[in-house]
Amino acid sequence: KSRSAFGEFLKAYQDAMVIPVDNSMVPPFHAWIAVPSFPQSNQVWNELMSLIPPAFIYRTNQDDRTIYLRGSQVRPWGLLEVKSCHNPEALQTAGLDFLWVTESQDIANKAFEKLLPTLRSPGRMSRAVFEGIPSLYSDHWFRRGCAAASDGRENHAYFHATVYDNPTLSPEDVAEVEGDKDLLPIRVWERMYLANFNEDAGYFNNVSRCIAGDL
């Protein structure tokens, strides 16, 4: 899934390089990768370093998780930032050409409320990819967004895949996945490996019914 999302980022970057931008737009190309917390950015950063062609990179700052990108005559440079969603108040005041949200199921509604306006800035391309396993609750933003895209919202697309759709898995890998049914509650296994939505897929199930008084 990360490679697919990276492909969308790369396409947005390449498309932007031929679209003139007003000189007041700083940075000329701006992209974020949003993760639930900063420690979870390590894998994303390592993948970026392996996937972005070196010719595209001007310089990097690993501590801040920022990559300055080489540009073109119409967009002199670009900025790619890995952003943590643990502090929603830090996720504002930017307009984005591309937003990639990873592990969407673990990002709070409050953080999404700050992320969404970054895609409503005039002059920006405002493309986005949201990926993850199903959220636990029907009122979570990722669940609502998937439902809207699945129902045909304009300019949105919904894709669903299971672990069995991964062509790189060996028969041994598949056997291990099947064996995890012995270790996990089936509702959790189906959420993790089949991407099935189930409000009882958490380790504390029936919570909603208990809250409603139906014990």
Predicted ranges, named:
Residues 76-77, 96-98, 123-130:
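Loop/turn-to-beta-strand initiation segments
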Residues 106-182:
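ASCE P-loop NTPase helicase motor core
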Residues 102-104:
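Walker B catalytic acidic pair
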Residues 39-97, 197:
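Inter-Walker segment of RecA-like/P-loop motor cores
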Residues 59, 68-75, 146-155, 213-214:
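Short, conserved catalytic or adaptor-binding loops enriched in Gly and charged residues
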Residues 1-66:
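Conserved P-loop
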Residues 166-215:
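ATPase catalytic-site recognition across NTP-hydrolyzing enzymes
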